[in-house]
Amino acid sequence: FVISGGLLLLPAPPGTPGSDRGRWERSEDDETRCRQALARLAGVLSALALAPPRVLSFPDRENETLALAAAELLGVPCAPFAPSAGPGLVVAYDLARVLPELVATLHHHAPGQLLWAHAARWTREQPVVGDLLSFLYRRNVSPWERHLILDPRRTDLPAGPPAEPPAELATRLMGRPLVPDEADEADEAALLGLARAAAAAPPAGRPALLQADGVRERLWIGSPVPHGPPHRDP
């Protein structure tokens, strides 16, 4: 939040192997984490009295699946993203996987247009950072790419990519149960408290979600908190 005004929905829990101050070193994303991120997304929007009229999706399986799930949760329609799309919640699984020419159109805030990027690689600079980020990673495998993990000891890995279309994947994702523990509830309470407090700040210090003009920050390598030598991936 200090660097970009974006809100982080799912910091890596303390003690997560390979994590670095809330950021995943190696992440194997799954539908349960996606479902949890969606719940926190809805909580933040409600806390800030934001009601996007629709969800805007980039092409590709990961983007469409998350966008359709978000639309179902928020009770709004889902439409393809276009530079002139106007108000709505723009959903990307990972902006690093979106065509650069589309990402470039998000450089400036637009009235009523919010940007949620589920995953963001914190070891490589990117031209735009989401107003909402689910998690930060150095290496990540999406829930629908687990067949690419090469580990003969893993009997739980699928043989290939999912055959279902994004609409069916979104329905399955939304069916994942949420079983929060005390740590989850404390994290969510802290997130919503930060969102409300920041919303009451002077305009320049408010969350990126509440900015109707100006530019979105880049995703910079590093952090304002102390840590080891900065990582930079090629």
Each language-model region and where it sits:
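PRPP-associated nucleotide enzymes
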Residues: F1-P234
